[in-house]
């Protein structure tokens, strides 16, 4: 039987040989690979940078959040780098002293001092109030310093003794002192300037005790709110809303609306470029506009602001109700005399007041004259009756009482409403916060249309805010209509204006105008650190970190690209060497076939 055997010995190159590819095609593949890899890296770089850019505002917001949390902690009086300042608010009903502190300035002339309210060991704000107002010293001005002694002693106990001599003291008097004759004002201030330095060694001079105007008080309130909201921090805010002054290139500030019991105030930033106005309006605008620089260097203009501020006496919620009652009383009595009626003269024949809840009875006394009211809860009719109290003029650029109002860009503005703006929306209606005109109007109208017994029962059941009382329930219908008319008819806010926030606290704390006052009064203090070379002019630490972060990202991707290119070049080099070896072994393979194949045939036998 014949036996056939085969040899499986083959050249080693046969086991690794791939189908032949033309050199031109291999070059194209290599070129596409070299082109594709950088494109992918570039795409990843762009995506990462976009993520980094969007994360910066979040990081900065987180930093601000941590700073706000730190503001609520007890002040470390052992820190030698802290500075202190005192502001006394001498109001009409009493006086309060506020203690503020701030760390050493960071040396950047573009930054403001980081002023915060001092907190004691229990993390409570360091503030003290006494009554009555300092205007009670009008007949005995020599006792004015005795009147303020408890406040200053309180502050001296909280400020470290070694810091007293460098702690500025500002005594700022408001409404109560404004009503006094100038002679009495000067006598009270003179006693303070003369006697207080004898007992307290705070940094205090004659210019630091004054009676401020309503305009100054409004500007200080505007400064304080915007400072707490971080609107004066212009660093890394490219994604924020644009300023009302497009040429400034900075964050948009907020306007404030504040309706108290007796007065109403509005303040907001206006563009520095004044529009063409008639001579009378231009003169009025100059009186109502305040332009100031919060920066320490007058050559730097990023903190120059132009603010419109006006106070309307008699337009507060309680005073407006009195004006309304006087108007109704006079008109009703005159109508009774002309028509021989007795409307409102007895509880059985009351005046039907659309501004009171349904069925609520009330009574008004004026000069031995009595008028009886009964609510009928018609919110729309109430608004109509309130319209004459706005005292508007036919001029398009006039607001309440015919006073000039600088134009507001309602498409690029933001406002915060305090006091009555918050109470009207929150205490009873429970819709405080973001204000929406139609929603508020519907809620106010529904409330006014409810029967008084139903509202009283809801109050007993605790369905309203804990701050609501019987007075709020009785006059909520009136005050909501008054607030609505003032906002939309008086100040010309659109009914669907989306950027009004009603609030009582800002970041869980009450913001006083005194904060704005000390910010403005101490604006030049950073120059001391700059001149002494304490820190010098340098970018903020956060900016350095962000620049370093960008540099590291670029360096990482550059190194990655170099490594990948080196790998590609190495693979190409290996491929070329392998191809040369394959070509060199081809003749040997042919020779091997010629020699071995015949031997295979010989092994085949019978």
Curated annotation (Swiss-Prot):
The chain crosses the membrane at residues 29-49, 549-569. GO terms for cellular component: cytoplasmic vesicle membrane; nucleus. Keywords: Calcium, Cytoplasmic vesicle, Disulfide bond, Glycoprotein, Hydrolase, Magnesium, Membrane, Metal-binding, Transmembrane, Transmembrane helix. Its cofactor is Ca(2+); Mg(2+). Its EC number is 3.6.1.15. It is a multi-pass membrane protein. It is found in: Cytoplasmic vesicle membrane. Residues 50-548 are vesicular. Signal peptide: none annotated. It comes from the Eukaryota. GO terms for biological process: CTP catabolic process; GTP metabolic process; nucleobase-containing small molecule catabolic process; regulation of immune response; ribonucleoside diphosphate catabolic process; ribonucleoside triphosphate catabolic process; T-helper 17 cell differentiation; UTP catabolic process. Gene3D superfamilies: 3.30.420.40, Exopolyphosphatase. Domain 2 (3.30.420.150). The active site is at residue 217. It catalyses: a ribonucleoside 5'-triphosphate + H2O = a ribonucleoside 5'-diphosphate + phosphate + H(+); UTP + H2O = UDP + phosphate + H(+); GTP + H2O = GDP + phosphate + H(+); CTP + H2O = CDP + phosphate + H(+). Its main location: membrane. Catalyzes the hydrolysis of nucleoside triphosphates and diphosphates in a calcium- or magnesium-dependent manner. Preferentially hydrolyzes nucleoside 5'-triphosphates, with substrate preference for UTP > GTP > CTP. Hydrolyzes nucleoside diphosphates only to a minor extent. In contrast to its human ortholog is able to hydrolyze ATP. In the epithelial cells of small intestine controls luminal ATP levels, therefore regulating Th17-cell development. PANTHER family: ADENOSINE/GUANOSINE DIPHOSPHATASE, ECTONUCLEOSIDE TRIPHOSPHATE DIPHOSPHOHYDROLASE 7. This is Ectonucleoside triphosphate diphosphohydrolase 7. It comes from Mus musculus. The lineage of its organism: Eukaryota, Metazoa, Chordata, Craniata, Vertebrata. The gene is Entpd7.
